């Protein structure tokens, strides 16, 4: 095989450019779908019904989920994954900070709404999600090339369409002050979601502030400014540390939603200790309904 020199690749690059320049009328169907079919309301709903018509996880978009350490980012990821799977999502979890075993222990609890889910339910749950949930079984760190290859492989072989990457700082070769590398990662992720028609959630940490009570916004994310500029959406998770047990435990914020009208908002959430689910006011934890047919599938 010939070496892939710039000269050899040049004709293909020109073809790609030709296909990238398209007349406005070629997009007519997509615009009609938006206005007539309600295409703007596509995507996976989040666990809180109040956001149903305000914001969803849509194909072709990427989301940054931010917060300080121990704010509940991984907890929220699991809850999002669980709710998305009930809507037909196929999820790939790339958690370099939490093993598949640990994630499933938590998911059993969240889906059963019980602090100690029984074994029968757990076995049914694992059978139910066998073609809905996949793990990139690696801990520690990986480089961006390996991450991208794994994502493309999972989409090609398993049809995954919701990818959760926890977190930015576990991608090897990226330092806190290496803004150029951070920008490269988020740009590649943004390109991938459009190319592959999937949704990627990337977890990032907030800058260390003088007080854990300081309110976060999208400018609080640690690292290059391009992180929040390049992504389509920014979601924030912040513990409130209130003294009154009746006050909310967490504030969940839609801090940026590029393709949604007036979606930015703050949502108060309360922790249900038994299930480890975060619930909006007057919302109840709902057990996932499973039956023996899932074992036979």
Predicted feature residues:
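Structural recognition of the conserved hydrophobic beta-strand(s) that form the central parallel beta-sheet
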Residues: 164-165, 198-205
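Conserved inter-motif catalytic segment of the P-loop NTP-binding fold
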Residues: 2, 6-7, 29, 87-177, ...
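Cofactor-binding loop segments of dinucleotide-utilizing enzymes, especially the Rossmann-like FAD-
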Residues: 96, 205, 239
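C-terminal regions of RecA-like/P-loop NTPase motor modules
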Residues: 3-10, 19-28, 144, 148-163, ...
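Charged helix-capping and loop-helix junction motifs
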Residues: 179-188, 217-221
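Short, solvent-exposed loop/turn segments at secondary-structure junctions
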Residues: 171-175, 207-214
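The Walker A/P-loop phosphate-binding site
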Residues: 11-113, 295-297
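Conserved catalytic network of the ASCE P-loop NTPase/AAA+ motor domain
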Residues: 56-58, 84-87, 126-128, 153-157, ...
